[in-house]
């Protein structure tokens, strides 16, 4: 009898089938993807310990459940196949989460701890000049600014050294003492070409006698240098002590956010993490203030020609404070950020229609004219509408002052949308938009500390704004060669 039962027992023994091996393979895949996700999330330093513990427990339970189902050999394989397919799906979601976490970290690293400052100079000729490239300027006399008048004298010299070999080893130059004299040298034919810092083009266009300079001339060569500024060390008390961020908005032709440029938006953001208060102080771009570098009076916007640290120092001197950090956005970038957020709700103090203005095309290769009408109260705006809303000044009697208020209204709307769960919908688009059009001197560690605070406390920020004003008049401006320009004298009562 024992000999007869022995074959039967052997026949009842269960062996692993392809379904079993599939299940075990999916368990291994699930474990690997879980580990990758956990490592990526921890490396971002954006999540609090509580969030990480919850995620770890969830991952542990998921993996334990799959092991319990897949490890034993079972006669019925349906549960193993279904569980294996579920493991594949979960692994895919975990890999997606890992990629999203890595993308978020890369985007923050790209904008945080900014230490580069880029200076760009152009070789400019008249629009009807036959020269189409720098090689066509052999024998030309190049007009340059004197060293004490040139905001980028080192870059000008580096440009001359760069083109010298291609022009027969010699470059003839003619030195001018101020910006308008340099432009006149080109118009009068005393110089075949001139070398200009990129910021000077906007400055010349703002002068009444040179308002068509950009249309009358053509850039045939561009030369840039970058220098590294001293990085700011992480602030261990950034989530507990007040700090000030200088917010600069530029409207540069170049899409490069690092380039030195006039600063059209100048806002000091005073942030108090403990009380969850943010005070935005807007200062008009035409404020007539002493430059920090030499004490010469100029428009506030012109301070940006010397670098963002100069603009921050000028505002610091004006209000008797010191900006701890700076943040900078290009107007073209503002459009991208708002679109990535699927629009923002902006509160307008007035009903107004914008004067037609140039805004960037979708592909970024050109511009087109746009104009919009905004109602008093809440307006849901896309990127282009928000850009026009923030730029407009000609529709208001107190132009620059109201524009500053509108800019702060847009900033408030962006902060509200970005700090809400709605941001998760377009997470990747927002990251792409921010990383290409926004920089800050806040370190990655500082930003991660603030993000953790937001997640931990679910903070709702109370944002208030304040704008200073003044009396307008015509005064000489240092960066424009002491040309007389319309400026705004600061209101001492408001500032003090």
Please report, for each region that a protein language model flagged, where it lies by residue:
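Membrane-embedded alpha-helical segments of integral membrane proteins
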Residues: 19-69
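Structural signal for the C-terminal ends of transmembrane alpha-helices
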Residues: 68-76
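Non-catalytic, solvent-exposed segments at the cell envelope interface
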Residues: 109-119, 124-128, 133-135, 140-496
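Internal/C-terminal transmembrane anchor helices
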Residues: 77-100
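Terminal targeting segments of Actinobacterial cell-envelope proteins
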Residues: 1-16
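Hydrophobic alpha-helical transmembrane segments in integral membrane proteins
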Residues: 95-113
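Membrane-interfacial loop-to-transmembrane-helix junctions in polytopic alpha-helical membrane proteins
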Residues: 15-18, 48, 75-79
């Amino acid at each position: 009898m024992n000999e007869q039962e022995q074959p039967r027992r052997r026949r009842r023994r269960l062996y692993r089938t392809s379904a079993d091996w599939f299940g075990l393979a999916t368990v291994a895949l699930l474990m690997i993807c879980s580990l990758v996700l956990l490592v990526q999330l921890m490396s971002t330093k954006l999540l609090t310990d509580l969030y990480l513990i919850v995620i770890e427990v969830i991952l542990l339970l998921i993996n334990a459940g799959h092991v319990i189902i897949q490890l034993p050999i079972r006669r019925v394989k349906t549960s193993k196949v279904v569980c294996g397919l579920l493991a594949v799906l979960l692994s895919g979601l975990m890999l997606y989460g890992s990629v999203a976490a890595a993308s978020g970290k890369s985007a923050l690293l790209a904008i945080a701890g900014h230490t580069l400052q880029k200076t760009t100079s152009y070789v400019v000729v008249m629009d009807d000049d036959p020269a189409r490239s720098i090689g066509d300027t052999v024998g030309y006399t190049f007009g340059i600014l004197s060293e004490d008048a040139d905001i980028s004298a080192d870059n000008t010299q580096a440009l001359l050294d760069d083109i010298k070999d291609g022009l027969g080893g010699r470059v003839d130059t003619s030195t001018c003492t101020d910006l308008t004299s340099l432009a006149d040298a080109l118009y009068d034919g005393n110089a075949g070409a001139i070398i200009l810092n990129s910021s000077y083009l906007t400055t010349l266009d703002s002068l009444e006698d040179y308002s068509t300079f950009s249309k009358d001339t053509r850039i045939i060569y561009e030369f840039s240098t970058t220098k590294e500024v001293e990085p700011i060390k992480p602030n261990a008390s950034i989530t507990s002590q007040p700090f000030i961020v200088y917010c600069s908005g530029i409207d540069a032709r170049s899409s490069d956010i690092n380039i030195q440029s006039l600063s059209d938006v100048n806002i000091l953001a005073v942030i108090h993490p403990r009380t969850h208060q943010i005070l935005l102080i807007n200062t008009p771009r035409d404020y007539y203030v002493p430059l920090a570098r030499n004490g010469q009076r100029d428009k506030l916007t012109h301070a940006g020609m010397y670098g963002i640290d100069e603009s921050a120092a000028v505002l610091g001197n004006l209000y008797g404070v010191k900006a701890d950090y700076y943040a900078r956005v290009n107007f073209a970038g503002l459009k991208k950020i708002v679109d990535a957020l699927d629009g923002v709700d902006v509160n307008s103090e007035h009903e107004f229609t914008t004067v037609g203005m140039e805004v960037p095309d979708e592909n970024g290769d050109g511009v087109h004219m746009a104009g919009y009408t905004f109602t008093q109260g809440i307006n849901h705006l896309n990127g282009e509408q928000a850009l026009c809303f923030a730029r407009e000044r000609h529709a208001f009697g107190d132009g620059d002052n109201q524009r500053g208020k509108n800019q702060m209204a847009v900033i408030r709307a962006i902060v509200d949308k970005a700090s809400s769960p709605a941001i998760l919908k377009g997470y990747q688009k927002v990251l792409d938009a921010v990383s290409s059009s926004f920089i800050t001197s806040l370190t990655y560690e500082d930003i991660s500390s603030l993000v953790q605070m937001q997640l931990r406390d679910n903070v709702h920020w109370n944002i208030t704004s304040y704008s200073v004003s003044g009396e307008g008049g015509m005064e000489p401006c240092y960066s424009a060669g002491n040309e007389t320009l319309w400026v705004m004298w600061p209101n001492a009562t408001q500032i003090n």
